[in-house]
């Protein structure tokens, strides 16, 4: 079964989901979430604080162990609002690469919305008809 890992570095928390494709459906193998408050200082000062960076790196290292344990074939790491706005985002993405080997993809707000929509309509029962989707993200 092909196994995939998705990591979301958000403004308030980091999330990990590892899933395998089985009979044309995703089967969740592992999930994790850590509140890191990456965006808290960004929205006040324009930069990611050293404390938020360290908290996020700790979470990502834990996620990395889970990804290795589940032998994910593909890993996608995305970052959202706080990373789009932070003046020191590039330095932080280098730290992530150094700590985990992962490249962080800082996605646009439009791509973020597209991915949220795709996740809801492909996994939520009843989401294929008319519905309203509201993203209450941290950024």
Regions found by a protein language model. Name each.
Residues 12-14, 139:
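Conserved Rossmann-like nucleotide-cofactor binding loop
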Residues 1-9, 17-134:
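Nucleotide/phosphate-binding catalytic cleft detector across ATP-hydrolyzing
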């Amino acid at each position: 079964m092909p196994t995939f890992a998705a990591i979301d570095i958000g403004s308030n928390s980091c999330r990990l989901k590892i899933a395998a494709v089985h009979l044309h459906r995703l089967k969740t193998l592992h999930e994790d979430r850590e509140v890191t408050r990456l965006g808290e200082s960004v929205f006040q000062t324009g930069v990611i604080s050293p404390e938020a960076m360290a908290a996020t790196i700790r979470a990502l290292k834990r996620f990395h162990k889970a990804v290795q344990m589940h032998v994910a074939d593909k890993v996608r790491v995305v970052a959202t609002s706080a990373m789009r706005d932070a003046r020191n985002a590039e330095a932080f993405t280098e730290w992530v690469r150094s700590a985990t080997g992962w490249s962080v993809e800082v996605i646009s707000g439009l791509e973020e919305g597209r991915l949220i929509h795709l996740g809801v309509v492909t996994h939520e029962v009843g989401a294929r008809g008319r519905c309203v989707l509201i993203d209450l993200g941290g950024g």
